[in-house]
């Protein structure tokens, strides 16, 4: 049986950030860690022939400086929720959770985690954009900031920054079940806390190390009770045995705890992924059922066959609309990939 190191048993630190205050703060929180100085994070992160599957059991941490910009226009497979100036930010790369279907496994060459400690430079880059227009920014697409907040403190800093800039709205997306954060942070109506919620079967089979679905639901309720706008993301929907029963039970569990009328909005979408990412994931995970499903290729993106996709999405629309007004339910269709569609009431 393989013996793995514990998570972050090894920390690689770029020489240029060894004296950075955030580097020191992070290292102070880690015990029994081997610290290795490196010239550039890509020397470790971009090495050839890494096994993401193996690294997921013993992730290393890389502390680095981003010098090439961290703010990007939103990708077409991501939901903009009707926001015109939709961007996302990469202040971290990779996630401490290990969801088999996650596109990060296809996008990055490594399973290790990179934290860019020069958050002040990212804020400066964003302020230059904010001087030109209002921005809707997803800050937690390429990592789960909430899950690693105890180590980085980035969530607190993003909330404080957003409160100072009235033309900025951010989304912080998570699968973490932490309830303790939100009552300790001052709420802002432009900081949307988005929880990805899955059926128990999907979470148990594919969302390794992530918080259990009921823990996420409780955390979402804590965020709402603390004054934060909360988005629930039933996205991606994963096809599984008895999917109707699984998703029906999940919806019942969610809305037995959460008042749907108080949600900011809801996201629904079936699994979809770039063909290039899936090709890489299949090579690394040949035994994964979710990765090796016979998807259809639509304009360079893989999705479920039309009969499965439409059945799943229509089922969820009907189930969720019993609790949430349809003008607050969003769904992305790869048929119209440039924009998500806001659902209209079904007559």
Predicted segments with their positions:
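Flexible, acidic/Gly-rich N-terminal and inter-domain linker regions that tether
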Residues: 1-85
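Conserved Radical SAM active-site core
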Residues: 62-85, 100-196
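Cysteine-centered iron-sulfur cluster-binding motifs in ferredoxin-type domains/subunits
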Residues: 89-99
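Conserved non-cysteine loop/helix-boundary elements of the Radical SAM core domain that shape
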Residues: 111-117, 142-153, 179-183, 191, ...
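Active-site beta-loop-alpha junctions enriched in small/polar residues
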Residues: 142-146, 175-177, 196-200, 237, ...
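Flexible glycine/acidic-rich beta-alpha junction loops that bind and position SAM and/or redox cofactors
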Residues: 205-207, 238-243, 263-300, 338
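Conserved C-terminal portion of the radical SAM core fold
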Residues: 216-277, 323-331
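Single conserved hydrophobic/aromatic residue that forms the stacking wall/gate
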Residues: 335-347
């Amino acid at each position: 049986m393989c013996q793995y190191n514990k998570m972050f048993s090894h920390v690689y630190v770029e020489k240029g950030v060894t004296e950075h205050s955030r580097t020191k703060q992070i290292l102070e929180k880690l015990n029994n860690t081997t610290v290795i100085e490196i010239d550039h994070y890509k020397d470790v992160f971009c090495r050839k022939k890494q096994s993401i599957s193996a690294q997921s059991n013993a992730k290393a941490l890389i502390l680095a400086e981003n010098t090439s910009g961290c703010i990007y226009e939103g990708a077409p497979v991501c939901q903009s929720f009707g926001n015109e100036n939709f961007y996302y930010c990469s202040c971290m790369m990779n996630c401490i959770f290990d969801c088999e279907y996650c596109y990060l496994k296809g996008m990055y060459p490594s399973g290790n985690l990179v934290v860019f400690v020069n958050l002040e430079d990212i804020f400066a880059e964003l302020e230059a954009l904010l001087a030109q227009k209002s921005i809707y920014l997803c800050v937690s697409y390429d990592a789960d900031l909430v899950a690693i907040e105890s180590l980085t403190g980035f969530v607190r800093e993003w909330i404080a920054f957003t409160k100072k800039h009235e033309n900025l709205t951010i989304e912080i997306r998570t699968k973490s079940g932490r309830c303790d954060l939100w009552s300790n942070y001052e709420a802002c109506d432009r900081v949307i806390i988005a929880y990805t919620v899955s059926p128990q079967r999907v979470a148990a089979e594919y969302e390794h190390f992530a918080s259990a679905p009921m823990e996420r639901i409780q955390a979402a309720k804590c965020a709402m009770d603390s004054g934060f706008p909360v988005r629930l993301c039933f996205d991606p929907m994963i096809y599984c045995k008895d999917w109707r029963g699984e998703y029906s039970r999940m919806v019942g569990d969610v809305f037995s705890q959460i008042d749907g009328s108080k949600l900011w909005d809801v996201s629904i979408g079936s699994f979809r992924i770039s063909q290039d990412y899936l090709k890489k994931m299949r090579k690394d995970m040949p035994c994964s059922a979710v990765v090796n499903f016979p998807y259809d290729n639509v304009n360079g993106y893989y999705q479920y066959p039309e009969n499965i996709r439409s059945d799943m999405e229509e089922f969820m629309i009907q189930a969720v609309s019993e609790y949430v007004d349809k003008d607050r339910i969003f769904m992305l269709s790869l048929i119209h990939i440039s924009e998500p569609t806001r659902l209209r009431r079904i007559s």
